[in-house]
A protein has these predicted regions:
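Catalytic-site signature of metal-activated, phosphate-bearing donor transferases
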Residues: 1-40, 46, 179
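Short coil turns that delineate tetratricopeptide repeat
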Residues: 11-12, 46, 50, 84, ...
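Start-of-helix register in tetratricopeptide repeats
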Residues: 16, 50-54, 88, 127-129, ...
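"A position-specific structural signal for the A-helix of alpha-solenoid helical repeats
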Residues: 20, 58, 92-95, 138, ...
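TPR-repeat structural position
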Residues: 31-32, 69, 103, 149
Length: 181
Protein backbone atom coordinates (compact mmCIF):
# COMPACT_ATOMS: atom_id res chain seq x y z
CA UNK A 1 0.00 0.00 0.00
CA UNK A 2 2.88 2.36 0.71
CA UNK A 3 4.25 2.00 -2.82
CA UNK A 4 0.77 2.34 -4.35
CA UNK A 5 0.29 5.58 -2.45
CA UNK A 6 3.70 6.86 -3.51
CA UNK A 7 2.84 6.15 -7.15
CA UNK A 8 -0.63 7.66 -6.93
CA UNK A 9 0.94 10.78 -5.36
CA UNK A 10 3.13 11.06 -8.46
CA UNK A 11 6.38 10.05 -6.79
CA UNK A 12 8.95 8.36 -9.00
CA UNK A 13 9.97 5.09 -7.39
CA UNK A 14 13.67 4.36 -7.08
CA UNK A 15 14.98 1.14 -8.60
CA UNK A 16 15.09 -0.43 -5.13
CA UNK A 17 11.51 0.67 -4.37
CA UNK A 18 10.29 -0.63 -7.74
CA UNK A 19 11.88 -4.03 -7.02
CA UNK A 20 10.34 -4.30 -3.55
CA UNK A 21 6.99 -3.08 -4.86
CA UNK A 22 7.02 -5.88 -7.44
CA UNK A 23 7.81 -8.42 -4.71
CA UNK A 24 5.07 -7.02 -2.48
CA UNK A 25 2.54 -7.35 -5.31
CA UNK A 26 3.64 -10.96 -5.84
CA UNK A 27 3.11 -11.79 -2.16
CA UNK A 28 -0.35 -10.22 -2.39
CA UNK A 29 -1.08 -12.41 -5.44
CA UNK A 30 -1.39 -9.46 -7.78
CA UNK A 31 0.63 -11.25 -10.42
CA UNK A 32 0.00 -9.11 -13.50
CA UNK A 33 0.86 -5.91 -11.62
CA UNK A 34 3.88 -7.62 -10.07
CA UNK A 35 5.29 -8.61 -13.47
CA UNK A 36 4.64 -5.10 -14.78
CA UNK A 37 6.58 -3.53 -11.89
CA UNK A 38 9.38 -6.07 -12.07
CA UNK A 39 9.77 -5.39 -15.80
CA UNK A 40 9.92 -1.65 -15.07
CA UNK A 41 12.60 -2.38 -12.47
CA UNK A 42 14.60 -4.49 -14.94
CA UNK A 43 14.62 -1.58 -17.40
CA UNK A 44 16.31 0.71 -14.87
CA UNK A 45 20.10 0.77 -15.28
CA UNK A 46 20.77 1.44 -11.59
CA UNK A 47 19.21 -1.80 -10.37
CA UNK A 48 21.37 -3.94 -8.09
CA UNK A 49 22.54 -7.08 -9.96
CA UNK A 50 21.33 -9.49 -7.27
CA UNK A 51 17.92 -7.80 -7.28
CA UNK A 52 17.77 -8.07 -11.07
CA UNK A 53 18.33 -11.83 -10.92
CA UNK A 54 15.80 -12.15 -8.09
CA UNK A 55 13.28 -10.02 -10.00
CA UNK A 56 13.46 -12.56 -12.82
CA UNK A 57 12.76 -15.40 -10.37
CA UNK A 58 9.78 -13.58 -8.86
CA UNK A 59 8.43 -12.64 -12.31
CA UNK A 60 8.75 -16.31 -13.33
CA UNK A 61 6.71 -17.38 -10.29
CA UNK A 62 4.04 -14.85 -11.25
CA UNK A 63 3.97 -16.26 -14.78
CA UNK A 64 3.54 -19.80 -13.46
CA UNK A 65 0.57 -18.60 -11.40
CA UNK A 66 -0.83 -16.98 -14.55
CA UNK A 67 -0.29 -20.26 -16.49
CA UNK A 68 2.26 -18.54 -18.76
CA UNK A 69 4.88 -21.27 -18.49
CA UNK A 70 6.87 -20.28 -21.57
CA UNK A 71 7.23 -16.72 -20.34
CA UNK A 72 8.20 -18.04 -16.90
CA UNK A 73 11.09 -19.99 -18.42
CA UNK A 74 12.14 -16.91 -20.40
CA UNK A 75 12.35 -14.93 -17.15
CA UNK A 76 14.44 -17.67 -15.54
CA UNK A 77 16.85 -17.68 -18.49
CA UNK A 78 16.96 -13.89 -18.38
CA UNK A 79 18.06 -14.16 -14.76
CA UNK A 80 21.20 -15.90 -15.99
CA UNK A 81 22.20 -12.76 -17.90
CA UNK A 82 22.68 -10.65 -14.78
CA UNK A 83 25.15 -12.75 -12.80
CA UNK A 84 26.76 -16.16 -12.67
CA UNK A 85 24.12 -18.82 -12.04
CA UNK A 86 22.98 -19.25 -8.45
CA UNK A 87 21.77 -22.45 -6.84
CA UNK A 88 18.34 -20.85 -6.56
CA UNK A 89 18.10 -20.07 -10.26
CA UNK A 90 19.45 -23.49 -11.27
CA UNK A 91 16.86 -25.17 -9.01
CA UNK A 92 14.07 -23.03 -10.46
CA UNK A 93 15.03 -24.02 -14.01
CA UNK A 94 15.45 -27.66 -12.94
CA UNK A 95 11.97 -27.57 -11.43
CA UNK A 96 10.57 -26.16 -14.65
CA UNK A 97 11.83 -29.22 -16.51
CA UNK A 98 11.04 -31.81 -13.83
CA UNK A 99 7.46 -30.49 -13.58
CA UNK A 100 7.18 -31.31 -17.29
CA UNK A 101 8.84 -34.72 -16.88
CA UNK A 102 11.85 -33.62 -18.92
CA UNK A 103 14.16 -35.52 -16.63
CA UNK A 104 17.45 -35.16 -18.53
CA UNK A 105 17.13 -31.38 -18.76
CA UNK A 106 16.19 -31.27 -15.08
CA UNK A 107 19.28 -33.35 -14.19
CA UNK A 108 21.47 -30.83 -16.02
CA UNK A 109 20.16 -27.90 -13.96
CA UNK A 110 20.09 -29.68 -10.61
CA UNK A 111 23.67 -30.87 -11.14
CA UNK A 112 24.64 -27.27 -11.86
CA UNK A 113 22.98 -26.19 -8.62
CA UNK A 114 25.31 -28.57 -6.77
CA UNK A 115 28.36 -27.14 -8.59
CA UNK A 116 27.61 -23.52 -7.73
CA UNK A 117 29.12 -22.04 -4.60
CA UNK A 118 26.80 -20.21 -2.25
CA UNK A 119 27.91 -16.60 -2.06
CA UNK A 120 26.34 -14.78 0.88
CA UNK A 121 28.65 -11.81 0.27
CA UNK A 122 26.71 -10.68 -2.80
CA UNK A 123 23.91 -9.27 -0.68
CA UNK A 124 21.28 -11.27 -2.56
CA UNK A 125 18.64 -13.54 -1.12
CA UNK A 126 20.17 -16.94 -0.32
CA UNK A 127 18.12 -20.12 0.00
CA UNK A 128 20.69 -22.49 1.49
CA UNK A 129 18.71 -25.61 0.55
CA UNK A 130 19.26 -24.80 -3.15
CA UNK A 131 22.95 -25.60 -2.76
CA UNK A 132 22.59 -29.15 -1.49
CA UNK A 133 19.36 -30.63 -0.20
CA UNK A 134 16.90 -29.61 -2.94
CA UNK A 135 19.14 -30.52 -5.89
CA UNK A 136 19.99 -33.88 -4.30
CA UNK A 137 16.35 -34.74 -3.55
CA UNK A 138 15.35 -33.72 -7.06
CA UNK A 139 18.24 -35.58 -8.69
CA UNK A 140 17.10 -38.67 -6.80
CA UNK A 141 13.62 -38.25 -8.30
CA UNK A 142 14.97 -37.57 -11.79
CA UNK A 143 17.24 -40.61 -11.80
CA UNK A 144 14.40 -42.76 -10.48
CA UNK A 145 12.24 -41.76 -13.45
CA UNK A 146 15.17 -42.21 -15.82
CA UNK A 147 15.38 -45.80 -14.56
CA UNK A 148 18.67 -45.59 -12.67
CA UNK A 149 17.67 -46.63 -9.14
CA UNK A 150 21.30 -46.81 -8.00
CA UNK A 151 21.98 -43.17 -8.92
CA UNK A 152 18.63 -42.23 -7.40
CA UNK A 153 19.68 -43.91 -4.16
CA UNK A 154 23.11 -42.21 -4.20
CA UNK A 155 21.53 -38.75 -4.48
CA UNK A 156 18.98 -39.71 -1.85
CA UNK A 157 21.82 -40.55 0.55
CA UNK A 158 23.59 -37.32 -0.32
CA UNK A 159 20.39 -35.36 0.44
CA UNK A 160 20.38 -36.97 3.87
CA UNK A 161 23.78 -35.49 4.64
CA UNK A 162 22.26 -32.03 4.24
CA UNK A 163 18.96 -32.57 6.01
CA UNK A 164 18.62 -35.99 7.70
CA UNK A 165 15.18 -35.15 9.09
CA UNK A 166 13.81 -33.53 5.94
CA UNK A 167 10.25 -34.59 5.15
CA UNK A 168 11.08 -35.57 1.56
CA UNK A 169 14.21 -37.43 2.61
CA UNK A 170 12.36 -39.46 5.26
CA UNK A 171 9.55 -40.30 2.84
CA UNK A 172 12.02 -41.45 0.19
CA UNK A 173 13.99 -43.35 2.84
CA UNK A 174 10.97 -45.60 3.43
CA UNK A 175 10.74 -46.28 -0.29
CA UNK A 176 14.43 -47.14 -0.67
CA UNK A 177 14.33 -49.42 2.39
CA UNK A 178 11.41 -51.34 0.84
CA UNK A 179 13.21 -51.62 -2.52
CA UNK A 180 16.50 -52.77 -0.97
CA UNK A 181 14.80 -55.63 0.96
Amino acid sequence: EIYQKMESDGEVLSARDRFYYGRELFYHREYVEAVDNLLKFLQLPEGFVENQAEACRVAARCCYELKQNGMALEFLYRGLTYRTPSGELCCDIGKHFSDRKKWEQAVFWYRNALQVSENAKTGGFVEKECYGYIPCIQLSVCWYYLGDIEKAFQYHCQAGTYKPYGREFLKNQQYFISVKQ
